[in-house]
From Swiss-Prot:
Chain intervals for the UniProt region annotation (Disordered): 135-248
Positions of the BTB domain: 24-92
GO biological process: negative regulation of transcription by RNA polymerase II; regulation of transcription by RNA polymerase II
Protein name per Swiss-Prot or TrEMBL: Zinc finger and BTB domain-containing protein 8A
InterPro entries: BTB/POZ_dom (IPR000210), SKP1/BTB/POZ_sf (IPR011333), Znf_C2H2_sf (IPR036236), Znf_C2H2_type (IPR013087), ZnFinger_BTB_dom_contain (IPR050457)
Protein keywords: DNA-binding, Isopeptide bond, Metal-binding, Nucleus, Phosphoprotein, Repeat, Transcription, Transcription regulation, Ubl conjugation, Zinc, Zinc-finger
Source organism of this protein record: Rattus norvegicus (Rat)
PROSITE patterns: BTB, ZINC_FINGER_C2H2_1, ZINC_FINGER_C2H2_2
Subcellular location: Nucleus
Function: May be involved in transcriptional regulation.
Stored Gene3D superfamilies: Classic Zinc Finger, Potassium Channel Kv1.1, Chain A
Residue spans crossing the bilayer: none
Modification Phosphoserine occurs at: S161, S167
SUPFAM superfamilies xref list: beta-beta-alpha zinc fingers, POZ domain
Length: 441
């Protein structure tokens, strides 16, 4: 039978012992402030303390002291309280410092809680932004609905009803409260995001819209004016032609002032289409850095936390970015591998040998040595000195020649690291004559 309250009661007793400095055998010094704790508790709660205390496990009788300069005492107080109570006190001001200290101390539970806290704060900020933009969309939508009424009232002031100046399909659209449906106009909330228009397209749009909003000819107006006289018809036709010319001129000058509710000008696009404009969505809550994607923000937060989640499988070194790890592995570990010149396979000092032909040296594996018939190489000391790997470039490799050979041949001094050849030549007879001539006077 398991008693769930036993764990919490045990933590309370240990925390009380820590506060009263009872059986505390470990001291942690953080920027001059000393914290008392128990080895067993620190060993069980932190991977860093587990590694540190296991190295000093033989000296259990002596008290252990650990010093840290990477985080502040307030940050370590939050972590130590979590170790002894299971309660983590996170705020918007200390979450980055606590996460950085937990990453250094290798406390995965604290890191996961800090990540969840940061993600929740980002979600809240995103919801506030979405709410703000939804309210702005409603405002722009209400402005777009009211514009047809302004358009119709302007025609009423000129002396005619709006129904008399529109085609038969346009009249019911205004009465039903859904204006300009025949011209593919939708409120801002129903529109799908579109890319920003180019400058030359924006200039051509007002002219195109005058064609779509073309007013009917006088003959069409006569068709709707039932019971009116011919004189009334001619006067109204003349009035419509003048009004049509005036509207076209106004639309070319300023499409917004003419009452077009779906004009694609720069001003209206910024009011009705806030989502079309490029806006940076994610802002770091601890600095002024702003990014577009959540993955970029997650990578940026590692600058504050010091987290390095990508370890090198060869040497164990950790990196904060995956491209840094691949570059490290390619330049450090792969570049130093020895390769057989013939088969291009990786060889070692045991599976290959260095072959020297004159001043040229290269490495061959044992199989390639057997194929080329060089398996019976002399094993005396002089030849062994020439079999030097590229890593032993600091050793001095010289030709061992007798004095007679030095007189007759050119002495070659070879540098193993850079494969440089330096020739030391005796002075010729011509140079000796030049040195003697100044003395004969």
């Amino acid at each position: 039978m398991e008693i769930s309250s036993h764990q919490s009661h045990l933590l309370e007793q240990l925390n009380e012992q820590r506060r009263q400095d009872v059986f505390c055998d470990c001291s942690i010094l953080v920027e001059g402030k000393v914290f008392k704790a128990h080895r067993n508790v620190l060993f069980a709660s932190s991977g860093y303390f587990k590694m540190l205390l296991s190295q000093n496990s033989k000296e259990t009788s002596q008290p252990t002291t650990a010093t840290f300069q990477t985080f502040s005492p307030d940050t370590f107080t939050v972590i130590l309280d979590f170790v002894y109570s299971g309660k983590l006190s996170l705020t918007g001001q200390n979450v980055i410092e606590v996460m950085s200290a937990a990453s250094f101390l290798q406390m995965t539970d604290v890191i996961s809680v800090c990540k969840t806290f940061i993600k929740s704060s980002l979600d809240i900020s995103e919801k506030e932004k979405d709410r703000y933009f939804s309210l702005s969309d409603k405002d722009t939508g209400s402005n777009g609905v009211e514009r047809p009424s302004v358009y119709s009232s302007s025609w009423q002031e000129d002396g005619g009803s709006p129904r008399s100046h529109l085609s038969p399909d346009q009249g019911p659209a205004i009465v039903s409260g859904k204006p300009w449906n025949k011209y593919s106009y939708h409120p801002a909330s129903q529109r799908s995001p579109q890319p920003p228009l180019a400058k030359h397209e924006q200039r051509k749009d007002p002219i195109k819209k005058t064609k779509h909003l073309r007013l009917p000819q006088p003959s069409e107006v006569v068709h709707f004016k039932s019971g009116k006289g011919d004189a009334r018809t001619s006067d109204s036709g003349h009035h419509v032609s003048q009004s049509e010319e005036q509207v076209q001129v106004d639309a070319e000058v300023d499409p917004v002032s003419a009452g077009y509710p779906y004009s694609q000008g720069p001003e209206v696009a910024s009011r009705s289409f806030p989502d079309n404009l490029p806006r940076l969505r994610f802002k770091c809550p601890y600095c002024t850095h702003v990014v577009k994607r959540k993955a970029d923000l997650k990578r940026h937060l590692r600058c504050h936390t010091g987290e390095r989640p990508y370890p090198c499988q060869a040497c164990g070194k950790r990196f904060s970015r995956l491209d840094h790890l691949s570059s490290h592995f390619r330049t450090i570990h792969q570049a130093c591998k020895l390769i057989c010149r013939k088969c291009k396979r990786h060889v070692t000092d045991l599976t290959g040998q260095v072959v020297q032909e004159g001043t040229r040296r290269y490495r061959l594996c044992n199989e390639c040595l057997t194929e080329v018939g060089m398996d019976s190489l002399p094993a005396d000391l002089e030849t062994e000195q020439h079999r030097v790997s590229p890593a032993d470039g600091d050793k001095d490799c010289r030709w061992h020649l007798s004095e007679e050979e030095n007189r007759s041949y050119v002495e070659i001094v070879e540098d193993g690291s850079a494969d440089l050849v330096i020739q030391q030549v005796d002075d010729s007879e011509e140079e000796e004559e030049k040195e003697i001539k100044p003395n004969i006077r």
